[in-house]
Amino acid sequence: MPLNFADVGEENIIKKIGGKPEVKKHLENLGFVVGGTVKVINKLGGNVIVNVKEARIAISEEMAQKIMV
């Protein structure tokens, strides 16, 4: 399922990252890698706030849809 559908407080394993190569590279640089864990902290104002690799990051729902967990 896409990351934006994950429940708040739930830790998930990243299974796939979709999108164009430059989008994949950008997400990888932020710490979103296949096999890594990501935890949804909050959802507000069209953004998804997550913990990934011990960092708190806000990404748009559009970006979150490209991350399959």
Residue ranges of predicted features:
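Compact, glycine-rich, soluble single-domain proteins
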Residues: 1-69
